Amino acid sequence: FFVDFYFLTLVPILGFIFNKKSFNYHRDDSYTVNLAHLRTMPISFEAMIASRIIQLIIPLAVNGTIFFTVQYLFAERLFDGMTVAQYISYALVWLGYAVLLSAVYIYSELTRSGKVYLGVTIVLMVCNIAAALICWFAKVSVIVFTVEVARQSPLLAPIIMSLVSWLAIYISIIGVRRKLKTRDLM
């Protein structure tokens, strides 16, 4: 149960940079304040959104590489018999999951207040707990399942997950663009 919950919760935040602002957003609504500041400058919505996507991709690539390399080195039993290509497929499936959930986080961060963003984060956490519990009661492991999928379909699994996750980002971008045009930042 714990390992599934850990992965379902931790992997999506590998693409986030944590600093003082990210821990106080629910109190001082720092994301909204930052957006209001950016709106006073000649910066397009597309540039703001692209900046946020870049702020997701770079930490996700760095943190994901570290996370999955360490996991590969220290969890030998789980990955016994996997080729490097299969393990990369496994890691890419999880990174796709991270991008998928990050689409929800980014949409909430850019279009809602800090308190609503905190609420969305809590709801996603509860969903992760529920998913991990359901898997535990069903005697299914999300980790083992993704390992098996990567073993059986090392090319197809990450392609499908990439398509789904980038579709989620695209939908999120459309929603953010639409909402930013009318969002009251005061």
What are these regions (language model features)?
Residues 1-33, 51-186:
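Hydrophobic alpha-helical transmembrane segments of membrane proteins
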